[in-house]
Amino acid sequence: MSFKTLCLATALTVCFNLPASAGAIMVQDPYARASGKSATSGAAFMMLMNHGAVDDRLVGVTSDAAKKVELHTHSEDANGVMKMRHLVEGAVIPAGGMHALERGGDHVMFMGLSAPMTQGDEISVTLMFENAGAVSITVPVDLK
């Protein structure tokens, strides 16, 4: 491998491993959970950071990976049963703070998958923020 090729490969590796950002919002460590071959839904998780001076809000999510993509959370009902529900109001990312989209909490929910989420695949996702606007990211599918 020539020195020029090595430098180019290194530069591309660094560029593709940088967090995605738009304005004050940065998205770090996104991943989707691998699904079974017959699964019709899946989920993605990531860390959202707001380096700005004002709160922002994640208000929507889109992807061609499923017929419907929403921001969901888990909550406990009166009988102590955990249920998933759509976060219609979105999720606030506080100024100078962060918000985790994580298992057992807020997360991106894919319903009506176009294809199974297979280990090693990548999913294109666009996050819509109230202030920062659209942030397009690539979400790797992992068995984490």
Regions found by a protein language model. Name each.
Residues 7-17:
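Bacterial N-terminal signal peptides
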Residues 1-5:
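Positively charged n-region of N-terminal signal peptides that target proteins for export
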Residues 23-144:
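Compact, glycine-rich, soluble single-domain proteins
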